[in-house]
Amino acid sequence: MVAAFWVMALVLFAMATHVGRRFGLIPIVSQLLLATFGLPLLMYFWIEPGWQLSGADLISPGWLKNLYSLSFALLLGHILSDVIDLRLDRQSLKIALPSFCIPFACGLATAVWLLPPQPWISSLAVGLLFAITAIPVLYLYLRHINYPPAATRRLVQTAILIDLTCWTLFAFAQGSLHLSSLLLPLAGACLPLLLRLLSLRQPLLYSGCFFALLVVAEHFKLNALIFGIGYLLCMAALKVPLVLPLPTAWMSRLQTWIAIPLILTFGIVQINVHNALDSLGGVQLAALLLLPIASKLLGNWLGLGWAGVSFEGASRWRESLLLNIRGLSEIVFLNLLLQQRLISPELYFALMLMGLIATLLPALAGMHRIPLNIAAPARSTRANS
């Protein structure tokens, strides 16, 4: 019955993705909608009373945990490869500074003053979740609405800077708790240097070792973030390109149809949504839904004003909404925190719901088309509102 549930879940995600595309939604939005609303209803009305299966039962098989580790490592590796592939741009840095700092500070304040007492690293994680954005989803959305290439590059580089800061801060904060959990991944991250000393230069070998060791690190609960960031930085220093384990098209299909649905389902079935909403309280729930979005929009607005207009006719309001998009990065981060028991199930659900709202905001604001006047270069030093 457990295997039947997981097959059914994958089929439901495939159907949701297909239906969403008919309405112009990118896959991650359809998947978030199903995970946030459909799966909890399915668990409450059918799986738990009818099949007599709890969330703990559904995630207990060893084969499923191995498949989860593999899927998580593939997604984390892909995200980190996007983060590390950075060509620093001064305008992107101007946007990223307030876009990260303001929601991060707001998240820390929320964790300390509005949420129940928790370890400092959990409060840090809440601050980072307020600030994080979504590189793949942002890029796909910008491409979907035919946003100007130069403006797209600037926004994506801003997202990369923010995500790199979030992942790196959390990785070292986590490693500081247990020195052994920091040293072992750092030693593994130096493998590219050893391979170069052995005169081995094939990018496929470096990349294969990266994904294999990332799976091992995730499976044995080592600090996969420290390993992943360090390994890719070594590869970048050696000018060795990362080669994905599968062709790009196949990798995209694997993520869309298996890895992302598996990770979303693995997280959401562990949550009793009714109890989660009751335990949070109205003020806490409202804060977790509204403050991340509001503080992120404020940071984006200030950063875009500091950096200046990206093209004639660009709107600070529209670009602020675009940089508020969450998605895959947030999902992976949330699951990482939930599996390590650094956040509660109710906090997981509230922030996933917030991420869905933030990701839908550009579409709800009517951003299906870009401004007509996009060809002329910018003359003003400030973006239009």
What kind of feature is each model-predicted range?
Residues 147-171, 245-247, 314-319, 342-352:
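Membrane-interface alpha-helices at helix entry/exit sites of multi-pass transporters
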Residues 43-48, 107-112, 163-176, 212-226, ...:
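Hydrophobic alpha-helical transmembrane segments in multi-pass integral membrane proteins
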Residues 7-10, 14-21, 161-245, 253-256:
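Core mid-bundle transmembrane helix pairs that form the ion/substrate translocation pathway
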Residues 11-25, 74-89, 136-147, 190-201, ...:
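C-terminal ends of transmembrane helices
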Residues 25-34, 89-102, 149-160, 200-209, ...:
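Cytoplasmic-side transmembrane-helix entry/capping segments in multi-pass membrane proteins
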Residues 43-45, 86-147, 277-373:
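Transmembrane alpha-helices that form the ion-translocation and gating core
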Residues 1-9, 58-75, 118-133, 177-190, ...:
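Structural signature of hydrophobic alpha-helical transmembrane segments
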Residues 40-91, 208-286:
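Membrane-interface junctions of multi-pass transporters
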